[in-house]
Amino acid sequence: MAAVREVGSKAELEAAAGGARAAAVHFWAAWCEASKQMDEVFAHLAVDFSHAVFLRVEAEEQPEISEAYGVTAVPYFVFLKEGKTVDTLEGANPASLANKVAKLAGPASVAESAVPASLGVAAGPAVLEKVQEMAQQNGASATSSAEDALNKRLEQLVNSHPVFLFMKGTPEQPRCGFSRKVVDVLKQEGVEFGSFDILTDNDVREGMKKFSNWPTFPQLYCKGELLGGCDIVIAMHESGELKDVFKEHNIPLQPQGSKNEEAVKAKPDTEKSGAVSEPALLTAAQKERLESLVNFSTVMAFIKGTPEEPKCGFSGKLVHILKQEKIPFSSFDILTDDEVRQGLKLLSNWPSYPQLYINGELVGGSDIVMEMHKSGELKKVLSEKGIVAKESLEDRLKALISSAPVMLFMKGTPDAPRCGFSSKVVNALKQAGVSFGAFDILSDEEVRQGLKTYSNWPTFPQLYYKSELIGGCDIVLELEKSGELKSTLSE
């Protein structure tokens, strides 16, 4: 059997791959079961394609190499020709691995007639046997991995451009009237945008419906947040709000010189969009009504839709933050009253929505509130104004520890652990059938350091049951080994 070579440094990898016509690199981790399974497939492929170079890198032990090749999860494969990356693969997909190796290295040494069409010419009998074994043993985990991979792909698509449109067809050839209308709006706004034709990929088409909780297409995103479909985009365009949203998020708008746009510019003032740019004034009655609304509640959110059913991603983000901070607030749906929608832009001198007010004073839109939330400034402002009681670190830790009967403080999330020890504890809890809450200590340094003192336990992960510390990774694994884990967490 041709050996898969373990690589211990970036220089060693570059030397091995640089001198080879074709090289495949497997980034793996000892704690990852999927890595072990894919490593067997990788080893069999090394036999079938003995004229190529096969290398292994333990991702966590070689951070310099992992960072150089953009590795954020395992198993991960990089395919190189003469030292240059030509393709990659993330996740446990033996069929894809076999096909990518075949494409990289050329025909295998096995007879093509022995290989099913589903794997192309990539795999020999040993690989096929391993694929079948993995399919039988890991059907459920493969489905989960596929869903995770799809969600990651969707997130990458949504964030690939500041403005991104999921549509039927292409901007040059829309395949439905609604998609055509949104493309026309974006062109009139003079904004550059990326797009994806959902007719070419049913996984993306169906996945986006769940991802966005929006059942139809087109779907327009700005800075990763859903603005809405055709009707909402057209309404925002006609009111001038779409342009305001782009400006608020520092998205450049290109001046358009077409005849159509000259005609738009020549329209009477009454037909122009963008209320803020007009020299209109509020009447005394309008101003009184708006001031009454912004002071209706101590914390007042002007959003599209309702807190239960936000009608745009930015409004949804704001509502989520307020709920996460446990801030009591009232709201007003600006889609139900255009006089309020346009008038509040003038009163606040703020061109877009949502808008958050505290004690009648404008705090800002979703981006500003998000930054304040991340930095802790939002809670500080609310505490200073007496809206929420100032929470001590100890109180916060107690609240977090008691937020679930079984609570795990870990690096990363249960779906994407960021260290081997955290991954082992997550796997142990899942195998024991224990439901648990989790907190990513990498997301909050104050919690990370505070919990060490509070629990008198210096490392992570830390597992709690009914607010009492059970222990770290070693203790959890001992309980699992002795069969006591589930009973300990259900007494």
Swiss-Prot record:
The lineage of its organism: Eukaryota, Viridiplantae, Streptophyta, Embryophyta, Tracheophyta. Pfam families: Glutaredoxin, Thioredoxin. May only reduce GSH-thiol disulfides, but not protein disulfides. One of its GO terms (molecular function) is 2 iron, 2 sulfur cluster binding. PANTHER family: GLUTAREDOXIN FAMILY MEMBER, GLUTAREDOXIN-3. It comes from Oryza sativa subsp. japonica (Rice). It comes from the Eukaryota. Keywords: 2Fe-2S, Cytoplasm, Iron, Iron-sulfur, Metal-binding, Redox-active center, Repeat. It is found in: Cytoplasm. Glutathione binds at residues 411, 448, 460, 473-474. [2Fe-2S] cluster binds at residue 419. The keyword Cytoplasm applies. GO terms for biological process: intracellular iron ion homeostasis. Residues 151-253, 287-389, 394-491 form the Glutaredoxin domain. NCBIfam families: Grx4 family monothiol glutaredoxin. Belongs to the glutaredoxin family. CGFS subfamily. InterPro entries: Glutaredoxin (IPR002109), GRX_PICOT-like (IPR033658), Monothiol_GRX-rel (IPR004480), Thioredoxin-like_sf (IPR036249), Thioredoxin_domain (IPR013766). This is Monothiol glutaredoxin-S11. Its main location: cytoplasm. One of its GO terms (cellular component) is nucleus.
